[in-house]
Amino acid sequence: MGYTLWNDQIVKDEEVKIDKEDRGYQFGDGVYEVVKVYNGEMFTVNEHIDRLYASAEKIRITIPYTKDKFHQLLHELVEKNELNTGHIYFQVTRGTSPRAHQFPENTVKPVIIGYTKENPRPLENLEKGVKATFVEDIRWLRCDIKSLNLLGAVLAKQEAHEKGCYEAILHRNNTVTEGSSSNVFGIKDGILYTHPANNMILKGITRDVVIACANEINMPVKEIPFTTHEALKMDELFVTSTTSEITPVIEIDGKLIRDGKVGEWTRKLQKQFETKIPKPLHI
């Protein structure tokens, strides 16, 4: 038996009831976050909460309690479910009202749901690297909002899956934007490249951590777009996300990235990232 965050309470899973006219269910009218938990501790949780509130504000949803209260509820959820290593998923929808495209009256309250899932770190992918495929980016023009509307990403990820690939690397007119569920980085001549954080991508929390790691090891960073052709010519390539951490990409559409092996700079960044992960408590 598990527990779920439901609005401002932690309740048993079976007590949660989602209304058929919840706007998240009918319109994808809401925002969400995923927080990694290592050894019982939430990783970069404040940054995720900040982004949740920012996304909500961009679509004019007011979350009905403070960030500190939200943090407290997530902490209670992790403890209640005795989560060791895994993640928390949580979302905020505009609420429940008779179906109509325009916003409901202000009396309608947002609906908040959160749950935890135990899952190990993707150590094999981190060590050996993965394959990817290029997919045209058909999503909308506000990818900076972490919206529940994920159909474009779902279709891209499915295409990658059917090709036996881990990730779809999205591009608009051959300019790489991001992955279907990740940010994309390339390394050339010791310089780290990634798409600038504008409306074409989600400004990933792990993306920010990786840029900080690069600064800490004196690795130059350039937030400028690069093309699919340039991606294939990179010395190293990797994708980042809350759950995939720094996952090397060794092949795209059958073409090896350099020699098809995980590169030296990627290993350095992984090592630096490792220093930030909460360690087990020894009593």
From Swiss-Prot:
Q: Which residues form the active site?
A: K146 (proton acceptor)
- Which reactions fall under this protein's catalytic activity? D-alanine + 2-oxoglutarate = D-glutamate + pyruvate
Positions of substrate binding: Y32, R99, H101
**pH-linked activity:** Optimum pH is 8.3.
Thermal profile of function: Optimum temperature is 60 degrees Celsius.
PTM-bearing positions, type N6-(pyridoxal phosphate)lysine: K146
Any Pfam family matching the protein: Aminotran_4
- Tell me its EC number(s), please: 2.6.1.21
Does Transferase appear among the keywords? yes
Record-linked CDD domains: D-AAT_like
Instruction: State the GO CC annotations.
Output: cytosol
Which key words are in the record? Answer: Aminotransferase, Pyridoxal phosphate, Transferase
GO molecular function terms noted in the UniProt entry = D-alanine-2-oxoglutarate aminotransferase activity; pyridoxal phosphate binding
Query: Which cofactors?
Result: pyridoxal 5'-phosphate
Gene3D superfamilies, A to Z: 3.30.470.10, D-amino Acid Aminotransferase, subunit A, domain 2 (3.20.10.10)
Subunit structure and binding partners: Homodimer.
What does the similarity note say? Belongs to the class-IV pyridoxal-phosphate-dependent aminotransferase family.
Function according to Swiss-Prot or TrEMBL? Acts on the D-isomers of alanine, leucine, aspartate, glutamate, aminobutyrate, norvaline and asparagine. The enzyme transfers an amino group from a substrate D-amino acid to the pyridoxal phosphate cofactor to form pyridoxamine and an alpha-keto acid in the first half-reaction. The second-half reaction is the reverse of the first, transferring the amino group from the pyridoxamine to a second alpha-keto acid to form the product D-amino acid via a ping-pong mechanism. This is an important process in the formation of D-alanine and D-glutamate, which are essential bacterial cell wall components.
Please give the name of this protein.
Answer: D-alanine aminotransferase
Q: Organism classification, top ranks?
A: Bacteria, Bacillati, Bacillota, Bacilli, Bacillales
